[in-house]
Structure formats: C-alpha cells, structure tokens
C-alpha cells in the first residue's frame, strides 16, 4: 500500500510527526529517496510535492495521500476526503498593499492583477465576489511580486501575517481556510489493500481522538463514591473496581486534557486520593 506525503514544505514535518504518533515510521532518512519502506509491513511512503498529491492519488500512483485541503480544491482531483487532521491550519487570503485604503474586497472597482499559485481558486473567488481582476499564475513566493510591479495583489497562504507585512502587504479577505487532510482515490475501498488502509485510517482516527485526552486513576472511599462520580465527565461512564483491602474503590475515567485542573480540583474536594494521570496514545472507537 502506498501512502503519499509531502517531500518538503510546511506540511512535511507535521505529517511525519503525526505518522510517528500513529506508529508509522520511515525506515530510511535518505532525502533523495522517493519511495520509502516503513516499519508497517506492506506500507510504503511515496514522497511527492504537496500540490501534486491530489492528482497523483486520483491517478492511482498512491492509494492514500496526506496533503493540504487547499491543494485538493485547487487541483479539482476526483478523490475522497477521508480524515481532516486538525493540523497544518492556515488561511488562503487576498492580500493588498498596506497603502491601499480598503477594508473589503467590495471596494475594489478598477481591474487589478492578482498573482497566485492558486489559479483555479483565485478565478472562482473573484467570480463569486465580483472583483474586477486578472489572475497571474506563478509558482514561487507570491509576496514579492507586487513590489516587483508584476501584480497589484496576491492570493496566498497566511499563517501569522508577519511575512505579508514584511513585504508591505495586508490581508483583505479570507479566500479559504485550509488544513492537512487524508485523501483516497475513488477505488481504494475495492482495492486489494482495503483492509490495510482501513486499519491505518482507524489508527489515525484513534490517534487524533486521543491527542488531548487524559486517563485518570484514583482511589475513593466508599462513602465518597457517589459525590466523586457525579463530578466526573466520562466518555461512557467511569470504570469502578473494589479495592482488595478497605472500604474504597478504584475509579478510572477519561477526560479532555484542558479540563484536567478543574476535574482534579473537584474530585479532591469530594474525597478522591492517590490520583494518577496518564497520557493516552490512541482511542479506538
């Protein structure tokens, strides 16, 4: 089974880190290698340009791919979006010179030139917004193009806005919000690799779900048990085990990590003790 991932760019390291968290690790660090075996038998990583992944997955060069949602839409590839990964988030924005006294794209009345690598997204955007513009397709860094006089504005990725400001630009409107996504060609469920792909997708979903989860173990006196249980949000319900000695119970539950301080304070106030908090690697549902 071939899994296409970015060979460089802003998504490469986050994708590799996520795969490592899932349990998929490349067995070679050779940056020149285009197809790399992994520790999962039968799964190979195919290193491709991020923007090429949707079209090549559609063509069957890989069964599954991880790329940006922006590139899926830009390519128009006939692929299935399988999982949104909740990382690699960014905005595709229309950016104009800081000197322009515009607060909205509706204020653009005269034709402008927009430089972008997102030609199809840009054409769709200006049509929907009614912006008089000519789209100039480029493949490199867009931020410098207005200062060179080759365009008036750009449509490009913005993470923080620092790079835009450095080049005398400001975001005027959001064209699209993007993130990393897992995609598959339309035939993956009927392929010989379907079972392997389904297992990998299950593990990915389990890793995503567990990313901000904590498991809590605590001992609770019998007389305090109901009060402690009432203070616990659980995925289903807390797991209870009677301790071998004494009138006490072991209580086990799973909570969101950002609620940990609040929950700890409540259970301690209600009589819990000997509390142990453990990170969760995966939750398979």
Curated annotation (Swiss-Prot):
Which domain of life does the UniProt lineage start with?
Archaea
The protein's matches in Pfam families, at most eight in alphabetical order, are given as: HisG, HisG_C
Q: Which SUPFAM superfamilies match?
A: GlnB-like, Periplasmic binding protein-like II
> An example Gene Ontology cellular component term from the record?
cytoplasm
Which GO molecular function entries does the Swiss-Prot or TrEMBL record give?
ATP binding; ATP phosphoribosyltransferase activity; magnesium ion binding
**Into which EC class is this enzyme placed?**
transferase
Keywords assigned by UniProt, alphabetized: Amino-acid biosynthesis, ATP-binding, Cytoplasm, Glycosyltransferase, Histidine biosynthesis, Magnesium, Metal-binding, Nucleotide-binding, Transferase
The protein's required cofactor(s) are namely: Mg(2+)
Q: Report the EC code(s) recorded for this entry.
A: 2.4.2.17
Pathway where this protein functions: Amino-acid biosynthesis; L-histidine biosynthesis; L-histidine from 5-phospho-alpha-D-ribose 1-diphosphate: step 1/9
Reactions it catalyzes: 1-(5-phospho-beta-D-ribosyl)-ATP + diphosphate = 5-phospho-alpha-D-ribose 1-diphosphate + ATP
The known regulators of its activity are described as: Feedback inhibited by histidine.
Annotated InterPro entries: ATP-PRT_HisG_long, ATP_PRibTrfase_cat, ATP_PRibTrfase_CS, ATP_PRibTrfase_HisG, HisG_C, N-reg_PII-like_a/b, N-reg_PII/ATP_PRibTrfase_C
Q: Where in the cell is it found?
A: Cytoplasm
Choose any GO biological process term that the UniProt entry carries and state it: L-histidine biosynthetic process
Q: What does this protein do?
A: Catalyzes the condensation of ATP and 5-phosphoribose 1-diphosphate to form N'-(5'-phosphoribosyl)-ATP (PR-ATP). Has a crucial role in the pathway because the rate of histidine biosynthesis seems to be controlled primarily by regulation of HisG enzymatic activity.
Give the matching HAMAP family. HisG_Long (MF_00079)
Similarity remark? Belongs to the ATP phosphoribosyltransferase family. Long subfamily.
Q: What is this protein called?
A: ATP phosphoribosyltransferase
Q: Which organism is it from?
A: Sulfolobus acidocaldarius (strain ATCC 33909 / DSM 639 / JCM 8929 / NBRC 15157 / NCIMB 11770)
Provide the taxonomic classification: Archaea, Thermoproteota, Thermoprotei, Sulfolobales, Sulfolobaceae
């Amino acid at each position: 089974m071939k899994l296409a991932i970015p060979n460089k760019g802003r998504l490469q390291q986050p994708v590799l880190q996520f795969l490592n968290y899932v349990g998929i690790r490349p067995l070679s660090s050779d940056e020149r290698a285009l197809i790399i075996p992994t520790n999962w038998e039968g799964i190979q990583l195919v290193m491709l340009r991020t923007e090429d992944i949707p079209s090549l997955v559609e063509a069957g060069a890989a069964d599954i791919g991880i790329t940006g949602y922006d590139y899926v839409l830009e390519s128009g590839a006939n692929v299935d979006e399988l999982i949104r990964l909740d990382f690699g988030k960014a905005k595709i924005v229309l950016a104009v010179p800081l000197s322009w006294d515009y607060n909205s794209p509706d204020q653009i009345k005269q034709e402008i030139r927009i430089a972008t690598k997102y030609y199809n997204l840009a054409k769709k955007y200006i049509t929907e917004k009614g912006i008089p513009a000519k789209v100039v397709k480029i493949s490199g860094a867009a931020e410098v193009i207005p200062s060179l006089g080759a365009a008036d504005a750009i449509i490009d990725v913005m993470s923080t806005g620092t790079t835009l400001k450095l080049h005398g630009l400001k975001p005027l409107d959001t064209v699209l919000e993007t993130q990393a996504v897992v995609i598959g060609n339309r035939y993956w469920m009927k392929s010989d690799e379907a079972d392997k792909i389904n297992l990998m997708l299950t593990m990915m979903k389990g890793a995503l779900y567990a990313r901000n989860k904590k498991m809590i173990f605590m001992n609770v006196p019998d007389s305090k048990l109901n009060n402690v249980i009432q203070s616990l949000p659980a995925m289903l319900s807390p797991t209870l085990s009677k301790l071998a000695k004494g009138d006490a119970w072991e209580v086990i539950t799973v909570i969101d990590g950002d609620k940990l301080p609040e929950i700890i304070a409540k259970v301690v106030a209600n009589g819990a003790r000997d509390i142990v908090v453990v990170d969760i690697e995966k939750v398979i549902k």
